[in-house]
Amino acid sequence: MQTVARKASVERVTNETTIALTLTIEGEGNVRVTTGFGMLDHMLTLTAFWAGFDLDLTCNGDMHIDAHHTAEDVALCLGQALATALDDRKGIARVGFARVPMDEALAEVTLDISGRPWLEWRGDEYLPPVIAGEEKDLWREFHKAFASAARMNLHVSYLYGKNGHHLLESASKGLGLALRQAVRRDRQTVLSTKGSLD
């Protein structure tokens, strides 16, 4: 039986950012990300690669101010693309969980593509105040925007660690692995006793 490729493209143009992305859920390892913020490029590349997605993403943002608008708008577009590619989410496993170590750091990511947006962000006291020249709260805002646009419950917990890069990398890989589990098709119907995900 041939299945339709789960794929979506999103474009967003505002006074703050210009974004174009294409996301393919059943990917072949083709990830190309250019946002103007190297740490964001790195973390998005890790997430897409570990999820098994193809991702082609470019963003031209107001980086002369800071990376906030770029990170938030990229997350909104990525979440929107995921929600569109999954359509009614029929047949997906829906839930994913991962713990990925990175040297001294360990983060845990749990998610449910339930149609109910929520971000639970724990343990960010382990993150240094500034990472790659940006305040640490940028990463909470990124994940909040992604969870909202993708309509998912997303719990990110930093369990321990010292190096900000390592902590973010642990969480980004964990997000990818959790997404890989959650988008997997393993049934013919919606995994919900109410018959729909919203």
Curated annotation (Swiss-Prot):
The gene is hisB. Its EC number is 4.2.1.19. The keyword Amino-acid biosynthesis applies. HAMAP family: HisB. It comes from Nitratidesulfovibrio vulgaris (strain DP4). CDD domains: IGPD. This is Imidazoleglycerol-phosphate dehydratase. One of its GO terms (cellular component) is cytoplasm. It catalyses: D-erythro-1-(imidazol-4-yl)glycerol 3-phosphate = 3-(imidazol-4-yl)-2-oxopropyl phosphate + H2O. Belongs to the imidazoleglycerol-phosphate dehydratase family.
